């Protein structure tokens, strides 16, 4: 039996955490004053000139949807110019950089066998790699399951000491303090990275120069069934095969995915590690890299993920993402001069639009349904045709983005997927509402996403 051991993580790893900029500080007095002014202005407007205020809000919402649709088409067009050469791999020899694989785990006993098998399938010299599997102190079931999976010597099981906030980035920082690698990658419990992904990343870092700080592997969802699973897969196809390639092609920062981020360890340490108070530490890190003058590029070899398959699993995960986007927006608008104008636009185009569009999906859909009913009864509202046009524009551009992204991943899009997206979008408003409530009441709470193991997919 391969020997493993539990290494008690060093609490002094706190030096890796950020003091500024960090989500720990919340909203600044200036940000709170601006928000209060907007709310008061809207309230006075509704009391004094309700019709005009509602009309202005309606126009703003419609304009937001049109802008999002045009941006989506623009990113699809730009992504088509992104060069997709076959993956170039580094030779498997003793000159390869040492790789540290960080795997934060919490209540993942069912996934222990799968993640150990997925890491063992990586085609990288064992003498040049290590894996640190971080388990919380009270998570005895996951620790026991990891031992039962018989991990080899190059996999270490680390126990994170009790502490707050209990988040994934905190666990990653504790592991980073013990990591020996020149390069670092983060994987989640449900991840199944392509066996050659580390070799591709090592080659890309060697060729990319010292200012290449990060490589993002695409996250793919294999063809699956079920409403939430398929919509989730198409979300990923749009994100990783249209939006991110377009941003990289334009030379702009990207909001990193929550896993399969490959980084130079010296760069990551110089940046202070991950912000343990940000529940989308990946999105924040993408902008922090750009602010510090580092580039991010994309890999071709993917990581296969397991989608959320039910509303009960989807809602807290999506709410956590949106809460983290809000945290990141607060961090990077606290002192707007940190980012140049172009990167500020990207910040709002990616994270800001995601939150705002999620908030207004359901209200706009309900409003349109009421207008349609009145139109059928012979009393069409003056804005009904405009609202219907806005919806159809958003629907069609989303369909184009879904098709373009899915075509690159091999995911088979069905006409029903596009039709059912009309029922999927309004659910984002529930997630956005929960995100805002949690940002106020439980800003650093990490909603855990449950996972179920799947048979390992053989990478093409």
What residue spans do the PLM features occupy?
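Membrane-embedded multi-pass helical conduit in multi-pass membrane proteins
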Residues: 43-72, 76-93, 350-441
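N-terminal signal-anchor transmembrane helix
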Residues: 69-128
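Cell-envelope/extracellular polymer assembly enzymes that use nucleotide-activated donors
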Residues: 97-100, 130, 269, 284
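Acidic donor-binding segment of Leloir-type glycosyltransferases
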Residues: 120-163, 206
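Long helical/loop segments within the catalytic core of UDP-sugar-dependent glycosyltransferases
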Residues: 147-183, 195-279, 319-330, 424
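The conserved acidic donor/metal-binding loop of glycosyltransferases
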Residues: 188-192, 274-277, 289
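Acidic donor-binding loop at a coil-to-helix junction in glycosyltransferase catalytic cores
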Residues: 279-285
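Catalytic donor-sugar/metal-binding loop of nucleotide-sugar-dependent glycosyltransferases
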Residues: 286-304
């Amino acid at each position: 039996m391969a020997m493993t051991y539990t290494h008690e993580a060093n609490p002094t790893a706190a030096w890796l955490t950020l003091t500024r900029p960090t989500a720990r500080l919340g909203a600044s007095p200036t940000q709170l004053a601006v928000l209060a002014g907007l709310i008061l202005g809207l309230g006075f407007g509704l009391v004094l000139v309700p019709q005009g205020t509602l009309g202005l809000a309606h126009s703003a919402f419609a304009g937001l949807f049109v802008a999002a649709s045009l941006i989506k088409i623009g990113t699809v067009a730009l992504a088509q110019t992104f060069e997709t050469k076959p993956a170039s791999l580094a030779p498997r020899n003793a000159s390869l950089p040492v790789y540290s694989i960080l795997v934060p785990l919490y209540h993942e006993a069912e996934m222990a066998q799968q993640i150990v098998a997925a890491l063992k399938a990586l085609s990288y010299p064992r003498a040049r790699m290590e894996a640190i599997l971080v388990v919380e102190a009270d998570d005895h079931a996951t620790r026991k399951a990891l031992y039962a999976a018989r991990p080899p010597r190059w996999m270490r099981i680390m126990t994170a000491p009790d502490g707050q906030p209990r988040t994934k980035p905190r666990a990653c920082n504790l592991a980073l303090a013990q990591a020996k690698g020149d390069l670092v990658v983060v994987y989640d419990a449900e991840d199944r990275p392509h066996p050659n992904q580390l070799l591709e990343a090592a080659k890309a870092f060697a060729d990319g120069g010292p200012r290449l700080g990060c490589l993002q592997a695409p996250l793919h969802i294999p063809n699956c069934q079920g409403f939430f699973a398929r919509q989730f897969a198409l979300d990923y196809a749009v994100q990783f095969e249209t939006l991110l390639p377009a941003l990289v092609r334009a030379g702009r920062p990207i909001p990193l995915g929550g896993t399969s981020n490959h980084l130079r360890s010296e760069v990551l340490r110089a940046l202070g590690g991950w912000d343990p108070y940000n529940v989308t530490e990946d999105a924040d890190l993408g902008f922090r890299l750009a602010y510090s003058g580092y580039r991010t590029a994309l890999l071709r070899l993917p990581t296969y993920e397991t989608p959320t398959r039910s509303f009960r699993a989807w809602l807290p995960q999506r709410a956590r993402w949106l809460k983290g986007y809000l945290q990141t927006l607060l961090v990077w608008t606290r002192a707007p001069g940190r980012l140049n104008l172009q990167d500020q636009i990207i910040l709002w185009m990616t994270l800001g639009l995601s939150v705002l569009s999620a908030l207004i999906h359901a209200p706009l859909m309900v409003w349109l349904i009421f207008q349609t009913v009145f139109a059928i009864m012979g009393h069409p509202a003056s804005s009904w045709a405009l609202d219907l046009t806005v919806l159809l524009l958003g629907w069609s551009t989303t369909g184009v983005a879904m098709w373009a992204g899915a075509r690159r991943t091999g995911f088979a899009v069905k006409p029903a997927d596009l039709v059912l997206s009309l029922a999927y979008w309004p659910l984002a408003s529930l997630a956005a509402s929960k995100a805002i409530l949690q940002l106020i009441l439980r800003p650093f709470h990490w909603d855990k996403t449950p996972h179920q193991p799947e048979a390992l997919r053989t990478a093409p």
